Amino acid sequence: MARFKAVNMSPRFLPVVLEQQLVPGTFEYALHALIDSEFDLSVLAAKFRNDETGAPAYDPAVMLKIVLLAYSRGLVSSRAIERVCAENVLFMAISGDTQPAYTTIAAFVRGLSDEITAIFTEVILICDRQGLIGRQMFAIDGVKLPSNASKAKSGTHAELAHQAQAIERRVKSMLKEHRKRDRRSEQGQHPDLAAERASRQERLDALKSDAKSIRAFLQSNAQRRSGKGPERKSNLTDNDSAKMATGKGVIQGYTGAATVDASHQIIVAAQAHGSGSEQSLLIPMIEQARAFATAQTVMTADAGYHSEANLKQLSEQAIPALIADGLMRRRDARFKGQDKYKTGPDPLYDKRPAPKPAGSGKFRPEDFAYDSQKNTCICPAGKRLYSSGQHCTTNGRTHHKFKGTKRDCVPCALRDQCLRTPETTPIRQVAFFHKGLASPLRHTEAMKRRIDSAAGRALYARRIATVEPVFGNLRYNKRLDRFTLRGQPKVDTQWKLYCMVHNIEKLAHHGYAQ
C-alpha cells in the first residue's frame, strides 16, 4: 500500500518579514515608495491636536496606503477593508500591521474632501516627471454610476409636496379606521389587541416621519435648475445626485468624468458631477486639464459633449479640439452598413424597446410630393397635408412645415411606415428646409469640416482607444460599480481616489522606484 508524507495542520509560528512582501514592480511597492518619499501629507497631519493629550492617531500616510491598496483590489466597503487589514499579509505589510476599525477608515475617506485635489495633482506631477504625459491629445469622457441614494425618493418640489400630502391623507384615513376597529372591539375578547395597536402605531409613526422629513426638505432646499432653466428633480437622500438615463435603465447617481492623455493613458483631470448632462462638463474638464496641456494639445470628446455654445467657447479661447456631432459616423463611409453587425438587446437587462426589423425605414421628407410654388404637400398615401407655417425657424434655419389631419392619418394603412411611434402620435408632420441657406451654427460647421478631414478622422479615431480602457480598468478590474458615499464632495473624493489608483498602477508598470 502506498505511503504518503503526513499532513500536519497544527498551529505554526512562521517568521514573516513584512517589508519583503512588497515586491518591486508591483502596485503595492510603487504605492509604498510613492507615499513615503514623494507625498507631502502635512496638511492631513495638521488636523490632529494630540501632541500632549489624547490617544495616538493612525498615520494619515498609512491610512492612505490602506485605502488605495483596497481600492486596487476591488474592496470599497470599510468593513471589508478592516477585515483584510487583520487577515491579509499584504495589507499587514503596507500598514506596518496596524488594524484600524472600519469607522476610522470610513471617517478618513470622508474627511479627504478638502485635500484630495492636491494629493491627486501630486500623482499627476510625478507621472509627468516620469515622462508618461505626451500632451499630444487628451480624451474626455464620463461614466454614469449609481450612488448611495434612493431613486424612489426623488422628484420636483411639486411632486414631493404632493407625495407628502398623500402620506398625510393616508395617516388620517388609517387613524379613522383604527378608531372604528377599537370601538368594535370588546375588552378581553382580543388578547392580542395591545400588540395590534402597537403595530399600528409603529406604522403610523413611520408614515408621519416620512411626511415630516419631506416637509423639512422642501423648506430647507431650493429648487434645482438645469443650465437651460427647467427644474431638475431633487432627491431626499442625496440632493447632489441626479437621475440619469443609461443603457441599463435610469439610475440615481453621479457622472465620473475623466480627461485622459493619449500617450500612456494617464488621467490628468477627474471630477464627479451630479448631472447627467455631458455638455455642461466639457469646459470644466478642459479647464482642469489645461495645467498639463500645451497650446497644441488637442482636446477630444464624443457627441454627448457637443453643443454650439461649447464649440464657440473653445474657438474664442483658441483651444484645439475635435468634438464629434451626432451625425459624424453617418458622414463617414467607413461606417456604412454597420447596423447589420449590431447585436439585439438583452431582454434581461436592456429596457429599451427592441429595434425595428431591417427594411422598416420610415418615410422621409423626400418621400412627400412638395410643390413650393403651389404651396402643397402630398403624403405617400396620396393625402394632402395642410400648411402650418411657411417661415418657421429651427436652429436658425427657415423651413416650411406641413401637418396631416386625424381624419386621414388615424385610419391610414401606412401609419407604421410614416410615424416613429404610431401608437401615441396621431398625425404626421413634415418640414422642408429652404435650400441654399448657410447654417447659422458657424462653429458646428467648422468642427464638422475639421473632424471629417483625413487628419481629423485619424486623430479622433485614437480617442476611444485612449479613454475607454481606463473606464474598463476602473469598472471591471477594480470593480467600481457604484459610489458608496453621499454628497458631491465625498463622491468626488472617492472618484479621485480610484483615478489615483489607475495612475499609480501606470507608474508601477513603467518601473517607478525599481
Regions found by a protein language model. Name each.
Residues 4-6, 67, 74-87, 96-514:
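Anion-binding and metal-coordination hotspots
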Residues 41-43, 52-53, 59-60, 84-96, ...:
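Helical catalytic core of nucleic-acid polymerases
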Residues 1-29:
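Hydrophobic alpha-helical membrane-insertion signals
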